[in-house]
A protein has these predicted regions:
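Positively charged, low-complexity terminal tracts
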Residues: 1-147
């Protein structure tokens, strides 16, 4: 059994400095459902969660990698992209999503997951959050860190 969440995101491949990046813009209305799906994936209650795009042009799937994989793997097949997550990446994503659902906004505008494709080339999965807090100035950051 899989979990499918329609209208959850927009998926776009971008190229920058000879590398491909998967840019996923998340629909704020779907964050709770995506968070629940990630929880179920981590607990191995589901083999996969599928995020349908708002424009109905593609699907993004998250699966859990078996074993102790430390780097995410991205598989691209026409209008479907699958991201296989290791335990640490899955835990990091889940923690970030839980905090975002709790607070109603993300702490930052995006998070990156380092990955490789089938050929071993490095890539990145960029998850963009439209609802996020304002950036913090350098002075404010120093103040918060006591520097």
């Amino acid at each position: 059994m899989n979990r499918r969440i329609d209208d959850a995101c927009e998926v776009e491949w971008k190229r920058f400095e000879a590398a491909d990046y998967l840019v996923v813009t998340l629909n704020p209305k779907a964050l709770s459902d995506v968070c629940l799906g990630l929880c179920m994936l981590r607990e191995q209650l589901l083999p996969r969660i599928e995020l349908g795009s708002d424009s109905k042009t593609g699907t993004l799937s998250f699966e859990r990698q078996s074993g102790g994989a430390t780097t995410a793997l991205v598989r691209r097949d026409r209008d479907k992209v699958t991201v296989l997550l290791g335990a640490s990446d899955l835990a990091m994503l889940l923690h970030f999503f839980l905090r975002t659902v709790r607070d109603g906004v993300a702490e930052v505008d995006h998070i990156d997951v380092d990955a490789v494709d089938r050929t071993g080339a490095t890539t990145s999965v960029v998850l963009k959050f439209p609802l996020h807090t304002a950036p913090v100035s350098a002075d404010e950051m120093r103040r918060r860190l006591g520097i």
